[in-house]
Structure formats: structure tokens, C-alpha cells
């Protein structure tokens, strides 16, 4: 009987030493159990059938506790683990915004023990969009970033004319210039080369040169119209050559107010077009009379360009003052023509 009491006293001393081993810490940083309590042992008849175990508060004095029977690894882990958990929890609380931060149990006065992993899991369930609390792994891409990239609309970096590989080509440029002097058209027609003048038919001298291959209409008022050039530079060069011919004939001609009045371009979209459907859909801008003219006339508002559209896919653009207006008009009309492509 005395031997059993001795064993019981040794067991109680060990339990008391184990209860006094762990330092007091907050329930928030406890990794396993919320409170230190007596461990139920079936060999102890006093505690095996006790349904309400008694909670014991630990003290902070460890001077009287003998820790020699425990290994150093367990003691070191128990000492280091609350520090690591506290450091991780402070980083998570700082990274979270003030509105999304979960209150600690000490603020709510609730005696629940939560470790750092359960806190992060509960926060990720409540706030799935918060990327600060859960860091994505480097092997697995972030699904949120992929979804945002897929939602963002992509705009083409190149104009439509370059995307489809079709660029309108300039076919004719009409320009005007003022020679600023009165002219004798009969004298010009008699002495100039490649010039003709028929006042009953047309009240201007028609003069032609080979390089650049153009035609000029010279009026007695000193105004001149130059047609047939393929570029702006060629049109200006041809007008200067005509003015030089007039100067050599003894007229005080000058070169004033040169201006491009009209540019004509053409292209081929390389597919047949349903003109009947196009004129029904865009009747405000187009007119189509196949008995009078085989092409559809489309009057674009901005830029102010007139387009002649044919069934074969050929398109003529006219009425532009600048080259960019030709390109812009074709970029606007090409998606419309593609919608009326013949099957």
C-alpha cells in the first residue's frame, strides 16, 4: 500500500512538472491546445471518469521546476515556436488592410486558441480576393491575374489596311497654280511644243509633258490646272515645268498659290461584294443604279470621301485633299465590305 502511494506521488509530481513547463502565452499563439490542462489517464481512477476536467492556470515562476528529465529539443521547440508564430501573425496583420483584418480573440474576449495556419486559412476563405494573405507559388500561375488579362479587351496595334495587307494606291492628283499674269493663248499654242488650242471646243490651251507624264490646262487669266501626277512631289514638279515653258515664251509668269485640289486612289479587296445588301443597309450614304452605272456610289461623311464600289471587289476613292484621308476612308469601309462578302 505504501508502494502504491509512492508511485502516485511520483506521478503527480511529474504531472505538476509538465503543467508548469510551458510558459504562459496568449491563446492566439498556442499551436495545439487552447489552455494547459491535466491530461486524462485511464490508470488514474480519480481523473478517468471525470467528465469536466479542471482547468489550471499556470504561473510564470520556473525556478522551482526541474527540467533535467526532458530532452533539450522539446524545450527549445516550445520556447521558439511561440516567437515564430507571433512574428508570422504580425506580418499577416500588417499586410492586411484595416477593414479586412480579422480581430484577435483578445479583442473579442473569446477564449479560443487559433494557430497561425488556421488564421490564414479562415482569412483566405472569407477574403478569397486578398492576394496579400496567401502568396501564390512560383510553379502555379495566379488565376486572378490570368482572368483579368482575359477580360481586358485587346485593341489592334496596326490599322486595318495594314492588317489585311491592302493599301490604296494613288492614281491621279489634280493641282492648281496661279501664274499671276495675262496670257495670249494663241501665241502659246503656236510656239510651244505638245500644245493644242481650240477655242470653240474648250477655252484653254492643253499642254503635255513626258516627265512626269502629266497634262496642263492653261487659261488666259493666268490660272493653270495640272492633272495626271501619281504623287504630290510629281504634281508640284510638273506645274513648275509648265510655268517655265510659259516664261520662256516671254510672259512674266510666277508660281503662286500651289494647291492640291483632288486625289484619287484605288484598291482591290480581293473578294466579291453583295452591292444589293450594302445599299439596303446603308441607304443614307449610298446609291446604286445598275442600269445607269455598274458601281455603288458611297458618300462617306468623315472623312469627306466618295467611294465607287464594284461587284468584283474593286474600290475607287476620290475627293481627298491629303493622302491620309484616302487611307482613313479605306480603313472605315473595309469592315463594312467584309460584312457583305459573297459566299
UniProtKB/Swiss-Prot annotation:
Residues 76-90 have a biased composition (Basic and acidic residues). Residues 71-152 are annotated as: Disordered. GO terms for cellular component: cytoplasm; female germ cell nucleus; nucleus. One of its GO terms (molecular function) is DNA binding. Ubiquitously expressed in all tissues examined with highest levels in heart, lung, ovary, spleen and testes. InterPro entries: TBP (IPR000814), TBP_CS (IPR030491), TBP_dom_sf (IPR012295), TBP_eukaryotic (IPR033710). SUPFAM superfamilies: TATA-box binding protein-like (SSF55945). Coiled coil: none annotated. Keywords: Cytoplasm, Developmental protein, DNA-binding, Nucleus, Transcription, Transcription regulation. Residues 94-127 have a biased composition (Low complexity). Belongs to the TBP family. Interacts with TAF3. This is TATA box-binding protein-like 2. The gene is TBPL2.
